[in-house]
Amino acid sequence: MPTVEELYRNYGILADATETAGQHKDAYQVILDGVKGGAKEKRLAAQFIPKFFKHFPELADSAINAQLDLCEDEDVSIRRQAIKELPQFATGDNLPRVADILTQLLQSDDSAEFNLVNNALLSIFKMDAKGTLGGLFSQILQGEDIVRERAIKFLSTKLKTLPEEVLTKEVEEFILAESKKVLEDVTGEEFVLFMKILSGLKSLQTVSGRQQLVELVAEQADLEQTFNPSDPDCVDRLLQCTRQAVPLFSKNVHSTKFVTYFCEHVLPNLSALTTPVEGLDIQLEVLKLLAEMSSFCGDMEKLESNLKKLFDKLLEYMPLPPEEAENGENAGGEEPKLQFSYVECLLYSFHQLGRKLPDFLTAKLNAEKLKDFKIRLQYFARGLQVYIRQLRLALQGKTGEALKTEENKIKVVALKITNNINVLIKDLFHIPPSYKSTVTLSWKPVQKADANQKRTSEDTTSSSPPKKASAGPKRDARQIYNPPSGKYSSNLGSFSYEQRGGFRGGRGRGWGGRGNRSRGRIY
């Protein structure tokens, strides 16, 4: 084993030789042997090996392996020095291997070491992005779970920081192709991270790019398979995938496939849905997703059939008025409970799809069915007015901090919900029914309307649907707080899939626990 003095002497030989250093193979071999010495010798070797690496291509494997030994040394300072120098080995055909090595080193629990690995990866990204990605994806597909997890997180956080000259169209196409391979076997959390990665790529910001992403999500959601409402993982997967798809939909990227699936398979089983998430109102979550998607539904093959399913589900939440006794009082003794949050979602979805078949209520329903529906609408609208008056009275004069209490937040949400329902009911009371009004769903941020877009959820309410609306509360009072959820109960928060992690148990097609890939060091 060489001493410190021998290492310095051989370093001098190579340094003095400059461009002819390659002729002094023996001197470089002495430096390589320095990794077998003590701490001082190893520190010198960690610096000297990469400095002259380019002059000895025939010793490339030996040099890289020697540096790797130092990357695994027990002395943290030696490890850090060796890792810091790794990018100097990333030349030509060696770069993917160095990227692979650095990806494996992401499993380090030493924060300074971990940061060095991140910086080293970013530096070789700028040399050859595609080659670096090859190393990262190699470990994501075949590496140990901890390496896979950290490699995915590296991509999800660091890719967006790279300049356009690094993330070229060719590089982005490579990311998409490799991501598709990974998506064949992912957990729920990994899927969310990959959607974050892919949706951030410039080449996928186009209409065709968004359409590709929607198709990827649809494949993950397994929309061709039979829906099992009693399987929490099946339900959870559908909701998580749908939640990823919703931001991708637009007037040019349609939600038809998802809306059709929800109408045909999910709505009929709404009451049977199960979820592994404690405290989640799974039925409301499904209805909210359907409402959000319904705005972007394109031409649907079985429109009338699916509109009928939606209509039937809406009727379940719009009760008939209770029968009155001879003295005019409620014979049953108890008023039916009005589920405003559910009705907002269902009525909005029906209103959106109804635009595509405007004669559904008049031509597709018999007269008795239409009469029954209008009775339900009128009864619901009466209850709505009572509730709206109570809410306005409770919120009257309250501004600023007073509106930020939990109780008042709930009331503000409730007022948005009831205003929305009222606007939609008024539309359906037109003869023939109208589908022209525009409302903003209660859990969505309020969009600034154009001057000509007068009929929105800011429309005020009336004592009966067909009559002129009375004055409502001040507009700014309702816009102070835009809560995430449309259910006005003590639970205001909208369920966040991004913060939940993966699915439980086996996945079938990729959802659940991944197979065992532990292989030890594979440098």
From Swiss-Prot:
Listed Gly residues bias regions: 502-515
Disordered as annotated region, ranges: 446-523
Localization per Swiss-Prot or TrEMBL: Nucleus; Cytoplasm
Polar residues compositional bias, start-end: 487-497
GO cellular component: cytoplasm; nucleus
Main subcellular localisation: nucleus
Keyword set, alphabetical order: Apoptosis, Cytoplasm, Nucleus, Repeat
Matches recorded under Gene3D superfamilies: Leucine-rich Repeat Variant (1.25.10.10)
Keyword check for Cell wall biogenesis/degradation: no
Gene Ontology biological-process entries: apoptotic process; negative regulation of apoptotic process
Chain intervals for the UniProt region annotation (ARM-like and Heat-like helical repeats): 1-360
InterPro entries noted in UniProt: API5 (IPR008383), ARM-like (IPR011989), ARM-type_fold (IPR016024)
Residues that span the membrane, as ranges: none
GO-annotated molecular function: fibroblast growth factor binding; RNA binding
Motif placement: Nuclear localization signal: 454-475
Positions with biased composition (Low complexity): 460-471
Subunit-level organization: Monomer.
Known function: Antiapoptotic factor that may have a role in protein assembly.
Family: Belongs to the API5 family.
Protein name (record): Apoptosis inhibitor 5
